[in-house]
């Protein structure tokens, strides 16, 4: 909670008065469902139509259409840029951010919707899979989704709309620069997407942020007595899809390499404590945990300027999983339902 508040304050510091989002009176490029005022629908139409100028962008909007998603603005999600909730079939965006940011947010979040349709996503979860398998899944999904946002923003730049690319490149150079370099050298989009995917792993602070969510989950669930191990190749084969085939041009086993599954000292310590408690309950140890390499995120020798700290925190917020926003919404909905049920029960008992 303290960390989230820190990022929220940092974003507020670096944000000027938000500019009004562009509006479009043109018909939607694809007939997705919109929710909101007439003005909000025109703003959403602009964002979606811009997305559809990119082939990759249109692909994920088609996924949203096929899965009956509703697009809307959500002003209650703090510094979160947006989220796609597969349970509620909603793609929500924060209207306080520029359209360029929201375009790459949609690309990232709806790429997750495509990933949710894979067998490996259904099979591999914290309840039944070992630590290494869960790390490979989460990281493959996030690296692929970020590489997808990179692809969409690049395609829009090529169509004469550079704002999304300029914003993405400034915020995520470790993803954008390898993409740009590989495309320039090879002319192969698959090579570029692979380079962007691998670039995701160069930000160790982001790795630690996602790992914290996994540790929190493992600390509160009752996982199976024996945890399954999955081959690295499956994560690439199923998550890195492009038209029925994997776009990934490197050895698929790399997702299980030290570079891709390393954890921070704190993460390994926390997981070891969790699995020590499991052992005391008679559950089998997870051999994959002991083999995980430990690599600490670098520490700045000199404190960064306040403006740099604020930007770094805001970018980190952009990379945060939107699960917290989704869970908060569901908790509010559950609480409201419980109040209604209690009121009805009280009425019937009179």
Model regions and ranges:
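Active-site recognition of the HExxH zinc-binding catalytic motif
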Residues: 104-117
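Post-HEXXH active-site segment of zinc metalloproteases
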Residues: 100, 116-143
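Short pre-active-site segment immediately N-terminal to the catalytic Zn-binding motif
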Residues: 91-106
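Extracytoplasmic/secreted proteins, especially bacterial periplasmic and envelope-associated proteins
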Residues: 43-46, 56, 101, 105, ...
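Metalloprotease/metallohydrolase-associated module, dominated by Zn2+-dependent proteases
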Residues: 132-210
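Pan-zinc metallopeptidase signature
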Residues: 180-311, 315-322, 326, 334, ...
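Auxiliary, metal-adjacent structural segments of Zn-dependent hydrolase domains
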Residues: 22-89, 98-99, 288-302
């Amino acid at each position: 909670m303290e960390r989230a508040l820190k990022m929220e304050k940092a974003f507020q510091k670096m944000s000027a008065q938000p500019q009004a989002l562009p509006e479009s009176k043109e018909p939607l490029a694809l007939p997705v469902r919109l929710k909101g005022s007439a003005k909000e629908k025109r703003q959403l139409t602009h964002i979606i139509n811009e997305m559809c100028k990119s082939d990759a962008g249109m692909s994920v909007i088609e996924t949203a259409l096929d899965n009956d998603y509703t697009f809307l603005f959500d002003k209650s999600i703090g510094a979160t840029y947006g989220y796609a909730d597969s349970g509620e079939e909603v793609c929500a965006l924060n209207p306080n951010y520029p359209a360029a940011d929201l375009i790459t947010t949609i690309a990232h979040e709806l790429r997750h919707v495509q990933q949710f349709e894979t067998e490996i996503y259904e099979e591999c979860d914290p309840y039944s899979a070992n630590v290494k398998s869960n790390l490979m899944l989460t990281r493959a999904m996030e690296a692929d989704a970020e590489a997808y946002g990179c692809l969409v923003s690049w395609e829009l730049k090529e169509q004469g709309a550079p704002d999304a690319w300029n914003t993405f490149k400034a915020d995520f150079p470790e993803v954008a620069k390898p993409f740009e370099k590989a495309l320039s050298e090879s002319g192969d989009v698959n090579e570029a997407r692979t380079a962007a995917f691998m670039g995701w792993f160069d930000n160790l602070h982001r790795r630690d942020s996602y790992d914290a969510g996994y540790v929190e989950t493992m600390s509160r669930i009752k996982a199976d007595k024996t945890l399954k191990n999955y081959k690295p190749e499956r994560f690439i084969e199923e998550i890195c899809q492009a038209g029925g085939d994997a776009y990934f041009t490197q050895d698929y086993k790399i997702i299980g390499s030290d570079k891709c599954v390393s954890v921070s000292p704190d993460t390994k310590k926390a997981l070891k404590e969790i699995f020590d408690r499991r052992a005391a309950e008679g559950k089998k140890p997870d051999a994959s945990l002991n083999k995980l390499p430990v690599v600490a995120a670098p520490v700045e020798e000199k404190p960064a300027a306040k403006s740099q700290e604020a930007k770094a925190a805001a970018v980190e917020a952009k990379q945060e999983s939107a699960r917290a926003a989704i869970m908060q919404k569901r908790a509010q909905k559950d609480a409201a339902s419980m109040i209604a049920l209690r009121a009805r029960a009280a009425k019937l008992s009179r």
